[in-house]
Structure formats: C-alpha cells, structure tokens
Amino acid sequence: MVQRNAPKKAVHFGAGNIGRGFVACFLHNSGYEVIFAEVNDTTVQKLNSQKSYKVIEVGADGTSESTITNYRAINSRLNEAELVQEIATADLVTCSVGPHILKFLAPVIAKGIDARSTDLTPVAVIACENAIGATDTLAEFIKAPENTNPDRLADYDKRARFANSAIDRIVPAQDPDAGLDVRLEKFYEWVVERTPFADHEPPAVEGIHWVDNLQPFIERKLYTVNTGHATAAYHGYIRRKSTVYDALQDREIQEEVKKALANTASLITQKHGIPQDEQQAYVDKIVRRISNPHLEDAVERVGRAPLRKLSRKERFIGPAAELAEHGKDCGALLDAAEMAFRFQNVEGDDESFKLAEIMEQNGPEDVVKQVCGLEPKEKLFPAVVDVVKRVQADTQSD
C-alpha cells in the first residue's frame, strides 16, 4: 500500500452551497485539489471558467472572507468516464447531495473504486448529509450486485474505506446575485468516525474531528440542530412568519422550540450518557445560532421536504418513537410534527404537494405508515394517528 506520488485530490459530489461553502472550503484549506462532480451544466461551466470564489463567514463579531481556488468541475451526467478516472486516483470522495440522491451516485463511484489499484492507499469515502448512517447507505448502494461484481468484494477494503460523518453548519438561502460565492455561519462541526482507518492514517483534513463512536454526535446534532431549526420553521410557517429569525422573535414559537429540544435532550442524555448541563449548554448555543439575524432564512426553505423530515429516522419521529417506547414525554415533538403535516402545497416544494395528496387520498393509519414508517405495534403510532386525524379534519373543513 503506497501513497500516490501526486498532490492530494478529492472528488466532491454536489457543487451546491454546502459543497462549495463547507466541504470544499476545508478540503482546499487542507491542500487538496477539489474536483466537483455536478449534474447542473451551468454550475459546471461557471466553476471551470471562474478560477476562484469567496466563502463569507457571518457571526455576531462580524464577517470574514476566504478565497477558494485549485478546483475543477466535471458534469457527472455527461462525462462519466472522466469522473471514473478521477475517483480511481483520488485520496478522498465526499458528497453533499441529499440522502435521497445517494443511490444515483453509487454506479459511478463503484466504477471508480473498481478501477483503483490496490497498490494505492484505499480511497476514503465520506457522505456529508443530514442523515444517520449516510455513508453506510451509500456503501450499500455501491456494493450492491448491480453496481459491483460480488467477486470483487473480498478485497474491497484495499480499495475503499467508508466512514460515516456528522456535519453541522447553517447555510441559509443565498443572494440570487451571489454567483459562486457562499455566505454561511462561522460555527461548524464536522465529526467523522475513525474506526474504518484502524490500520492506517485517516485522510488529513483540517476541521474534521475524528471519533471512535459517531452515534452520540450525529444524534445530538440531528435531534438538536435539525429538530430545533425545523420546529421553528414549521411553527413559523403556520403563524405566517417570513424567516426563522422572525419566528424566534415570537415568544410562543420560541417556547415550542425549547420544549421540543427538552424532549430530545431527555433522550440524548439518557441514551448517550451526556451530562444534562452539557446538553443544555449545547441546546442554548443552538437556539442562539438559529436565531442569528445575519442568517435570514425563509421558513419555506427550512421547512422544505416535509416527507423526508417526517420519516422514521428523522428529526421528529426518530426521537419521539424512542421516547414513547420508554414512556417519556414527546408531546412537543408531536406538536412540531403536526405543524410539518400542515406544511402542504407550498410553492417551490414538490414534497409539500405530495404530502397534501397523500393526506387527501389515505386514511390516517395508512398516512402514518407511509409517511412516518411507523407500525401499529409501536407505542408512538396511535399518537401520530391522532395528529394526522386532526390535520385531515382541519383541511377538509377549510
């Protein structure tokens, strides 16, 4: 196993705001050439014609800028062969495309790994998504028989290692005239599991915090940051607030957020042994972050994709189901889920229209099974059925 005798190279799928502003920024600062794999040809052309862009970090103490260079872009839809060769010789493959897109990345990544020499250090594959076990999910797609010959799996760890991660950074909607520049908050957290690299050094990336057990970090993040952010957005949308900041100036909404995070805190502290005062300090910090007036974010943008956010392993149903099984309070999470069920027919969000269709065409029990992935035997099931009944009754009376 040898290192490539070449500058460090990373392939990143997804040249959106998180890809350019968060992941690529750290890769650039760590000395990697970044190859963006992107399906939007306009974005590909912009990246290839513009040799730098700015990342603007916004905080209570003002703003700071950094310039990102040393990157290229490949249209992954049109130039697969070129992308396969880049993956075959990359040190690192990352992505920020949304959990539902991972299956579409798998074929080309599988081809790149298959073409990789076992003389090289295995390529590190890290999915940077708001989902528990996203890299495991991607790995399953990559190793599936339709993408990888099963005979090649025997020595697969000589070609690739897969590490789950938890990412945390608020990237609001951008100015339409910003071009490639990205504006985001100064705070960040990028935690990656170390165990897949037990027999050699993990990739050197500035900003990554390597841990042996990722689950406490990713659940704390998903069930605090994402739960809090979405709770504010959905309650804010129903109360006709324009931004998350506006929503959190409303005392009632602020209380709803705090109650939801008290629900999740009780799960996190018990399940992962995190001291209550430490978790409360984390909650307080998160509420301050999502209340940042410099990161104006429309409630419609933060609330988009309600079907995903109401799913079984996501920010509301995931923690609520665990709490219910232990007989613990999850009332505020159910209240937030109710607001998410009311997020229907929102312009620009396909899932909100699909949600309205599901709610109209199905009985409450079937809605809960289909949308939330809950089964009747689970203790949370009847409570969510009641939520759906309430929303359906109100919708029919409108």
UniProtKB/Swiss-Prot annotation:
Mind listing the UniProt keywords for this protein, alphabetically?
NAD, Oxidoreductase
Where along this sequence does the record place binding of NAD(+)? A10, V11, H12, F13, G14, A15, G16, N17, I18, G19, R20, G21
Cellular component, GO, one term = cytosol
Q: Which reaction does it catalyse?
A: D-mannitol 1-phosphate + NAD(+) = beta-D-fructose 6-phosphate + NADH + H(+)
EC number(s): the record gives 1.1.1.17
- InterPro entries (UniProt xref): 6-PGluconate_DH-like_C_sf, 6PGD_dom2, Mannitol_1_phos_5_DH, Mannitol_DH, Mannitol_DH_C, Mannitol_DH_N, NAD(P)-bd_dom_sf
> Do the record's keywords include NAD?
yes
What residues make up the catalytic site? K221
List, alphabetically, the Gene3D superfamilies matched. Answer: N-(1-d-carboxylethyl)-l-norvaline Dehydrogenase, domain 2, NAD(P)-binding Rossmann-like Domain
This entry's Gene Ontology molecular function terms read: mannitol-1-phosphate 5-dehydrogenase activity
GO biological processes: mannitol catabolic process
**Any single Pfam family the record assigns to this protein:** Mannitol_dh_C
Which enzyme class?
oxidoreductase
Where is the signal peptide, in residue numbers?
none
Chain's role = Catalyzes the NAD(H)-dependent interconversion of D-fructose 6-phosphate and D-mannitol 1-phosphate in the mannitol metabolic pathway.
Q: How does it assemble?
A: Monomer.
Q: Which family does it belong to?
A: Belongs to the mannitol dehydrogenase family.
UniProt xrefs under NCBIfam families: PRK02318.2-5
Q: Would you tell me the protein name for this molecule?
A: Mannitol-1-phosphate 5-dehydrogenase
Q: Which organism is it from?
A: Chaetomium globosum (strain ATCC 6205 / CBS 148.51 / DSM 1962 / NBRC 6347 / NRRL 1970) (Soil fungus)
